[in-house]
A protein has these predicted regions:
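Conserved phosphate-binding/catalytic loop of the ribokinase/pfkB sugar-kinase fold
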Residues: 61, 87, 97-137, 142
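Conserved phosphate/ATP/ADP-binding segment of small-molecule kinases
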Residues: 150-153, 157-162, 167-238, 246
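Glycine-rich phosphate/adenosyl-contacting loop at the front of the ribokinase-like
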Residues: 1-61, 66-77, 240, 247, ...
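Short beta-strand scaffold segments in enzyme catalytic cores
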Residues: 47, 94-98, 107, 227-231
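Structural motif
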Residues: 5-6, 136-137, 185
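Short gly/ser/thr-rich secondary-structure transition/capping motifs
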Residues: 79, 118-123, 165-171
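Conserved phosphate-binding/catalytic region of the ribokinase-like
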Residues: 1-7, 30, 204-315
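A glycine-rich helix N-cap at a beta->alpha junction
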Residues: 74-89
């Protein structure tokens, strides 16, 4: 593996997760446990990529509070170079999720107004321009405003660097709608793919055509424990994740898949191999209590990769 320069722009905040201990009872008090850590789609991916051996810089707005200090400490622990712009009079964004006993999401609340201040003007600052110019990969999540995502695509157009996106949620993925053609890859789940295209796929094999018609040249659509599909301009493939006997928490699994996929892409691996690496990274995260698994490493990824079947190439 060659160590690459990576810039990540997007969410770096506090994740709060409550896990219900028994069968979920809507509209009632449910016994459970509470857990808090640094998170965010971009930040989870940044930490994974750093643990896989790359030089990663994280750019994100932050409040001048203890939550911001928690995020900074998490960046340092993972080896991420922290490049925040801090608003001393604001609070750091947060994401609060309630999970069922099996780890699946019941409902979540995102308190993330601060990200609206990540304006296109921030991309014009000299330090940011130099950081982007020096990067082999630029990864952005949809916590950024739509106009900032569009400006980022325009700023990286005509270069050799890879530009990728993380959908974050069905409500936020539509922020990419004006700049899909400028992305090399977008990582999303099926609900996010539906929100982006306004269409329903009868089978996973239909997503590449639907997303290409929407203007996207490459991407990955995950479907929980069912087959995931990846595509680029010319090819597509389908892979079924291995069955997992125990599920710790689904939080961060999609971000991990993006990390594993992109790390393989930077190594020159083909589409099918990238999807296998992405699934392996997601498996590592699904077995971890953390949104960015501390066990993420090239060695552990290679070990889990042996459990992932070869993808089926689609015509």
């Amino acid at each position: 593996m060659t160590k690459r320069e990576i810039a990540v722009l997007g969410g770096a905040h506090i994740d709060r997760r409550g896990r219900i201990s028994d069968t979920t009872v809507p509209g009632a008090s449910n016994p459970g446990t509470w857990f808090e850590e640094a998170g965010g789609g971009g930040f989870n991916a940044a930490r994974n990529l750093a643990r896989l051996g790359h030089r990663v810089r994280m750019i994100s707005p932050r409040g001048g509070d203890s939550a911001g200090e928690t995020v900074a400490a998490a960046a340092a622990a993972a080896g991420v170079i922290d490049c925040p712009f801090t608003f001393l009079d604001r609070k750091t964004p947060s994401y609060t999720a309630i999970l069922e006993k099996d780890g699946n999401l019941v409902i979540a609340l995102a308190d993330m107004d601060l990200y609206a201040l990540f304006s296109p003007r921030r991309l014009q600052q000299r330090a940011t321009r130099e950081l982007l110019a020096a990067s082999d990969l630029v990864l952005a999540d949809a916590n950024l405003p739509q106009e900032t995502l569009t400006a980022l695509v325009e700023a990286t157009a005509g270069t050799n660097r890879i530009l990728a996106g993380i959908a974050v949620s069905p409500a936020k993925v539509v922020r990419y709608s004006q700049c899909l053609a400028g992305l090399d890859f977008l990582f999303m789940n099926e609900a996010e793919a539906r929100a982006l295209t306004g269409a329903e796929a009868a089978a996973a094999e239909e997503w590449p055509s639907l997303l290409r018609s929407a203007g996207l040249s490459g991407g990955v659509v995950t479907r929980g424990g069912k087959a995931a599909v990846a595509f680029d301009r010319e090819t597509a493939c389908l892979a079924v994740p291995p069955a997992l006997p125990a599920l710790a928490d689904v939080t961060g699994a999609g971000d991990a898949l993006a990390s594993g996929f992109l790390a393989a892409l930077l190594d020159g691996i083909g589409l099918a191999g990238c999807l296998r690496h992405g699934i392996a990274a997601a498996i590592l995260t699904l077995h971890s209590p953390f949104a960015a698994a501390v066990e993420m490493s090239p060695g552990n990824l290679a070990r889990v990769l042996t459990l992932v079947p070869e993808p089926q190439m689609l015509s």
